[in-house]
């Protein structure tokens, strides 16, 4: 296991859904529910869903801050093909 600490996102403890170990290096990382993070910004900061999603996408989900960078889970809606979800959520490069 890595000696680096697992990093957290300030103000989003209620969106933590677990921890996992990132390979290689066996670094423990915190796992967040992306939709819960959006809901926190909507409730706390009065953002719309779209504004919160854009803010998190630009400022948080795409950031790399070292080996302890958290993981953000985006749930695939039931019945939606994974490839379609990836394209809609992350663009054509996914």
Where does each model-flagged region fall?
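C-terminal alpha-helical interaction appendages
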Residues: 1-94
């Amino acid at each position: 296991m890595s000696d680096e600490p697992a990093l957290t996102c300030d103000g989003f403890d209620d969106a933590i859904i677990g921890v996992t170990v990132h390979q290689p290096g066996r670094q423990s990382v915190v796992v967040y529910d992306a939709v819960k993070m959006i809901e926190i910004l909507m409730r706390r900061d009065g953002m719309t869903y779209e504004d919160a999603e854009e803010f998190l996408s630009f400022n948080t989900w795409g950031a790399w801050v070292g080996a302890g960078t958290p993981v953000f889970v985006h749930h695939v809606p039931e019945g939606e093909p994974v490839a379609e979800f990836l394209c809609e959520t992350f663009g054509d490069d996914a």
